[in-house]
UniProtKB/Swiss-Prot annotation:
Coiled coil: 551-675
Region feature Disordered, mapped onto this chain: 309-331, 475-675
Organism from which the protein derives: Aspergillus fumigatus (strain ATCC MYA-4609 / CBS 101355 / FGSC A1100 / Af293)
Presence of the UniProt keyword Transferase in the record: no
Domain BRCT residues, every copy: 352-471
Family: Belongs to the pescadillo family.
Protein's UniProt name: Pescadillo homolog
A family per Pfam: Pescadillo_N
């Protein structure tokens, strides 16, 4: 007979451990335990049965894997936490004795500093692993870079986050790795491709942030400590991969004047070259630039060698041209059949992204968001960006009347000239040397666009029409570049004629007309009811007492209460009505012919209604036929496949209904705009 197993020695009770037991086992405080778990990437787990996992009668709420806690026993950070606890006791003892100087000395010189380098190496064995986990790090660091300094968020933390974020942005600008961006309610989404990994992060808008007290900034500060170390490692590796020195030179005075990205100076090879991606595997660009620098003498010798060898130049040149074209352009994948799935197309390469805004000179007005526009324009090849001196240093020009400016980004409404302020007078000391332009004026030879034009251009991968984004114009919808239209769904970019079903527009018009007629009938009935009520009030006598009805009223009520005689009388009455309508229509046609006038009023409407009715019948018959065919096909299926098909049909029907609602809404908006 086997031994009876003791409770809590196997199963879930052995695999899981409560948080209280873990804190006792590690001999640290609960805040230090939280920090240690965040640094090491250990999170609470949910057992299948909490009663079995718990060794006590009450089911606990927080559980961890026992192996994870066993793994934490050998962590070097535990020693640092214990040293911090010992120093904190000494500082408290000194403050209790009134020795403030000793307490300050202990805090400054003897407080142990945590280093997370070994934690980063343990959690991310390869650089690709670090890139995959960079989304949350960038989102949190960009958030703290835009927060105001408070007691919970010190200025040093904000400055560190700003410096790391600007360094990462400089790498994206140098290598043209930024691919897409989207303006949302939460903030601005960015997507970059680094070594084949897509990185997506969120940057908040630069509004005045109100720090609430319900946010636990201690937990967030722990994540910031970890992510700053991670981003420092990543930036060093990225800068080293393209031959740049890290960290780059930082001008404090320029940063205080609002230069931001311009406060950094990159040093190393490849900084002054053309705006192309500088990567180890990108050897085609370097070979092409080296070939252009070959002297004429060497080229002549090569030509002589080719002629002496008897090679056909005519055959070699087109081959070279085709190889160059294939290396510069991106292949487009087309579906084999029109009903096949849409194939995902490749994104822009670094060279194409670096030349999108390269030939232009931009000027950012004061009301436009300078920081995101500068980052996007520089990441897509623009080298000359100017703005007003109020926005900070680092601009290509502060003169709005510069003739080299080709595009100006404006985000203000169109106002009449009478309401515009006058040009401010220049100062006497001559410090205001730059000429001021009257607000709202247009300088010839320049394209004025709204900020959305920049985002739509980079998402489309080409320059879109700037007249659609003129100042004061109604902007086209700003769509997410990551949401692709599915088959049968609503596509806001396509026209209604391309995506609506057969007869959908006519049916929608008929339903709208019926709704309008119903509302007009309701209004007429309401007016008639009001009139009848007023007549009843006038006819009421004897203080509202009931008056006996006459014999005529009784006979009318008896006639109304006659028995139902069946559908034959209704059919006969309908046929009589149709004959009467045809007779009256023929009579009107004869009268119009005798008067010499064209008969088109009632005839056209009746013909149109007949056509619509016949078309609706055809569509209904077609749908009925398709449903019958589908039912016959379902009869040949097994029960499992039939259930799966019904689920698919249900989901597709829901999607088509939502798409039809959106198309109907768009149809009404277009009609209203046309009127």
């Amino acid at each position: 007979m086997g031994k009876i197993k003791k409770k809590g020695t196997s199963g879930q009770a052995k695999n899981y451990i409560t948080r209280t037991q873990a804190v006792r086992k590690l001999q640290i405080s609960l805040p230090d335990f939280r920090r240690l778990c965040i640094f090491k990437g250990i999170y609470p787990r949910e057992p299948r049965n909490k009663k079995k996992a718990s060794k006590t009668s009450t089911p606990n709420t927080t559980f961890y894997y026992t192996k994870d806690i066993q793994y934490l026993l050998h962590e070097p950070l535990l020693r640092k936490f214990r040293e911090q606890k010992a120093v904190a006791k000494k500082i408290a003892r000194s403050l209790g004795r009134g020795e403030v100087g000793d307490a300050a000395r202990l805090e400054k010189n003897h407080a142990p500093k945590l280093t997370l380098d070994h934690v980063i190496k343990e959690r991310y064995p390869t650089f690709i692993d670090a890139l995959r986990d960079l989304d949350d790090a960038l989102s949190l660091l960009f958030l703290f870079a835009n927060l105001p300094s408070t007691a919970h968020v010190p200025p040093k933390t904000i400055a560190l986050c700003q410096r790391l974020c600007h360094e990462f942005q400089h790498y994206l600008i140098t290598t043209n790795s930024l691919r897409k961006s989207f303006l949302s309610i939460k903030g601005i989404y960015y997507q970059a491709t680094i070594q084949g990994q897509d990185i997506l992060w969120l940057v908040p808008y630069r509004f005045v942030q109100r720090v609430n007290g319900d946010v636990d900034y201690r937990i967030m500060a722990t994540f910031v400590d970890f992510y700053t170390t991670l981003l420092g490692f990543v930036n060093f590796r990225l800068y080293s991969s393209i031959g740049l020195r890290y960290p780059p030179k930082f001008d404090t005075r320029s940063d205080e004047n609002g230069a931001e990205l311009a406060a950094f100076t990159l040093e190393g090879r490849g900084v002054g070259d053309a705006p192309k991606a500088i990567e180890a595997g990108n050897t085609q660009a370097t070979t092409s630039t080296n070939n252009k620098e070959v002297s004429k003498e060497i080229q002549a010798k090569v030509d002589n060698v080719i002629k002496s060898a008897g090679l056909d130049e005519a055959k070699e040149e087109p081959a070279a041209e085709t190889t160059e074209e294939s290396s510069e352009t991106i292949d487009k994948f087309e579906p084999a059949a029109p009903e096949a799935d849409t194939l995902p197309q490749p994104d822009l390469s670094g060279n194409e992204a670096g030349s999108l805004f390269a030939p232009f000179t931009f000027y950012i007005s004061r009301e436009a968001p300078r920081a995101p526009l500068e980052f996007i324009l520089r990441a897509f090849g623009c080298k000359r960006i100017g703005w007003d001196a109020v926005l900070g240093d680092g601009a290509f020009t502060h003169d709005e009347t510069d003739t080299r400016i080709t595009h100006q980004i404006v985000d203000r409404p169109q106002l009449p000239e009478s309401s515009l302020p006058a040009i401010p007078a220049a100062s006497k000391d001559g410090s205001d040397a730059v000429q001021k332009v009257k607000p709202g004026t247009r300088i010839p030879g320049r394209t004025y666009v709204q900020p959305q034009w920049v985002w739509d251009c980079i998402n489309e991968g080409r320059l879109v029409r700037p007249d659609l984004y003129a100042p004061g114009a109604t902007l086209p919808p700003h769509l997410s570049p990551w949401v692709k239209p599915s088959r049968g769904g609503y596509d806001p970019k396509a026209s209604l004629a391309e995506q609506e079903e057969e007869g959908e527009a006519e049916l929608d018009e008929d339903s709208d007309e019926e709704m309008e007629e119903a509302t007009s009938d309701k209004k007429a009935e309401a007016k008639a009811d009001v009139g009848s009520e007023s007549e009843d009030e006038d006819e009421s006598v004897d203080g509202g007492m009931d008056v006996a009805g006459t014999d005529d009223d009784e006979s009318e009520s008896e006639d109304e209460e006659e028995d139902f005689d069946g559908f034959e009388e209704e059919a006969a009455s309908e046929s009589e009505d149709e004959e009467e309508a045809a007779r009256t229509q023929h009579q009107k046609e004869l009268e119009a012919e005798a008067a010499g006038l064209p008969f088109s009023s009632n005839g056209a409407t009746s013909d149109g209604s007949k056509k619509k009715a016949s078309q609706a019948k055809k569509i209904a018959a077609k749908k009925r036929k398709e449903e019958e065919e589908l039912e016959r096909q379902k009869m040949m299926m097994s029960r499992k496949k039939r259930k799966l098909l019904e689920k698919m049909i249900y989901s597709n029907k829901k999607q088509s209904e939502e798409a039809a609602k959106l198309r109907s809404k768009r149809r009404k908006l277009e009609k209203g705009a046309a009127k």
